[in-house]
Amino acid sequence: MDGNAPEPRYWEKMRLVAEVLKAVEGPIYIATHVDPDGDAIGSSLGLYRALKALGKEAYWVADPPRFLRFLPKEEEYSDPVEKLPPGATLVALDSAEPSRVVGVPVEGFVINIDHHGTNPRFGHLHVVDPSKAATAQMVKDLIDLLGVEWTAEIATPVLTGILTDTGNFRFANTTPEVLRVAAELLGYGVKLAELTDRLQFRPPSYFRLMGQVLSTVAFHFGGLLVTAHLPEDAGAEEDSDDFVGLIRYVEGSVVSVFLRKREEGVKVSIRSRGGVSAQNIALKLGGGGHVPAAGATLKGLDLDQAYERVLEAVREELTRAGYL
């Protein structure tokens, strides 16, 4: 089966997940992937609030980036754990592989809900559907099946996940279904203007850093690929999370890649369009993700070595797609 194909048993599997969660009497841990984005935080926080509304013993284990810290309340955070207690259930959301789940061990009864085509379908129960724009879209369906009464507090993080993974409805994954779901969530009292403002706010350090990043912009393969990186002496790594989105709109480009050096290697963020697969590029680099958006971490390499690997992988994908 094509890993990027829709899940043919989507509703059957999601109903089973809902039945299991309603029947669980022990603790439920909700976790997501390392370096969480809006979908990771939105889907996990929304499900956490829904389970709490059901009276479940739920724990939300996540570390949101600065621009998303307005969403959770202080008392909603739970500390990371090294071992789950007996009888615990783990719900892993938006995590393309078990090794990316952070804050909790992948053990106990594991439920895996995700929309990454490269997900290996881990867990005792898994619902993986790459046709969905966001894991938050899937969580919306799950919350409906749980029979929880929708409130603005539950709907706001869920809509956040959809907004961020669709680029505020600008990306190709914005389908009529996505817009219908968003409209329904708005009907539960989400303050859209306030939410979108908060999602776009960035600290002054972000704009100072922007100048340094833009000075590294380079064009390759006749402008088909645009790259940039975070200078190693720039600091403020957290402020660089969305710079790949800044360079993706260079006219004439079909691939954009942003690199940043970390202790374990170089993190590579990839975006693509025009029949080019960011997923294929990421897989060549040992990573994964979606066709239009993917990433990888090149362990043990410096920036120059990482650039060499990236250029080689992009060249192969541009050739496959007929651009070279």
Swiss-Prot record:
Gene Ontology MF: a single term: nucleic acid binding
Coiled-coil residues: none
Catalyzed reaction equations: adenosine 3',5'-bisphosphate + H2O = AMP + phosphate
Cofactor: Co(2+); Mn(2+); Zn(2+); Mg(2+)
Disruption phenotype: Reduced growth in minimal medium, possibly also affected in cysteine assimilation.
Known function: Bifunctional enzyme which has both oligoribonuclease and pAp-phosphatase activities. Degrades short RNA and DNA oligonucleotides with a length of up to 33 nucleotides, although the enzyme is most active on shorter substrates, in a 5' to 3' direction. Converts 3'(2')-phosphoadenosine 5'-phosphate (PAP) to AMP, has very low activity on cAMP and cGMP.
Family: Belongs to the NrnA oligoribonuclease family.
Self-association and partners: Oligomeric.
Protein name as it appears in the record: Bifunctional oligoribonuclease and PAP phosphatase NrnA
Organism: Thermus thermophilus (strain ATCC 27634 / DSM 579 / HB8)
Lineage, opening ranks: Bacteria, Thermotogati, Deinococcota, Deinococci, Thermales
